[in-house]
Structure formats: structure tokens, C-alpha cells
Amino acid sequence: MSSNKINKKSIARIAAVQAIYQNILQNNDDMDDIMQNVLSFYQNNNAITDLPENLKISLSISHFKMLVKSVFENIHKLDEIIDNHLTNDKDPAHMPILLRALLRVSICELLFCPTTPAKVVINEYTDIANDMLNEHEIGFVNSVLDKIAKEHTRLI
């Protein structure tokens, strides 16, 4: 039986969203503690019980750590960017936590990881959003990332 693998960077992106979600939910600013909790979960293959037997999950630890550290270092700038993309009738304080976590990580990778093409970042996080968010939020993620990618390329 052949074993299937999911891209290690894709798993790192999901794990980074989980770490930032944990940061927001628990109001925990101990980045090392958060990263260790998430890494422990992924390193314990028995913790993920609803996967097919032949599916192997492992993440790029370096990409995960880079994403989480970059979000922590740029959190205020990221939140400002997110809030600037909200329509006037939306209150930033009422944004769902998971949506904010996903946007923080995705915008961070889009702006601060120039080695990853914008199209890849947009596709990856739209796929992640498809598994985690409702239809309206998925469209919002795609729209915001697309706008930021276009704005960013004009600045280069």
C-alpha cells in the first residue's frame, strides 16, 4: 500500500493558523509555549485520529516557526492591514477569531515571505479557509489576499 503525503509547508501553514488562533483565544503571548504546544500535537501521530491509515502528516518546522515568529513580530501592522480591508459596517472587534488568525498568517506570508509566489499563498490559504470557515468568510479571505497581493506588487 502506497503512503500519501500532504505538502509539509501546507501542514506548517495550518499549524501556524492553529498557533495564532491559540494565541488569540487564550490571550497567551508566550510564543515559544504556543509553538511547542502545536508542534507536540503534530509530532504525536496518534493525536490525529480521523485520518486514513496511509496518510502521513508532517510539517516543515522551519516554515511553521518562521510564520509564527513573523506574525508575532508584525502583529500590529497585520491587524491594521486587516482592519483597513473591512467595510465600514464591520467592527474589527467582532471579527471571528479563526478568521483573524487565518488572515494574520496568510497576510504575513504574503508580505514577509517573498520566496513564496503570491498565487501559491492565495491558493493555499483559500484552501485552508475552505476547510475552516463559512462561504462568506472564504470569499473575504480570497478577496483580501488578492487585493494585498496586487497592492504589494505595485510597491516592488
Curated annotation (Swiss-Prot):
GO MF annotation, one: RNA binding
One Pfam entry name: NusB
CDD domains the UniProt entry points to: Terminator_NusB
Lineage: Bacteria, Pseudomonadati, Pseudomonadota, Alphaproteobacteria, Rickettsiales
Gene designation per UniProt: nusB
Xref: PANTHER family: ANTITERMINATION NUSB DOMAIN-CONTAINING PROTEIN (PTHR11078:SF3), N UTILIZATION SUBSTANCE PROTEIN B-RELATED (PTHR11078)
Top-rank lineage group of the source organism: Bacteria
NCBIfam families in the record: nusB (TIGR01951)
Keyword RNA-binding: yes
Gene3D superfamilies: NusB-like (1.10.940.10)
Known role: Involved in transcription antitermination. Required for transcription of ribosomal RNA (rRNA) genes. Binds specifically to the boxA antiterminator sequence of the ribosomal RNA (rrn) operons.
Family designation: Belongs to the NusB family.
Name the UniProt record assigns to this protein: Transcription antitermination protein NusB
Sorted UniProt keywords: RNA-binding, Transcription, Transcription antitermination, Transcription regulation
A Gene Ontology term for the protein's cellular component: cytosol
UniProt keyword Transport present: no
HAMAP family attached to this UniProt entry: NusB
GO biological process, one term: transcription antitermination
Disulfides per UniProt: none
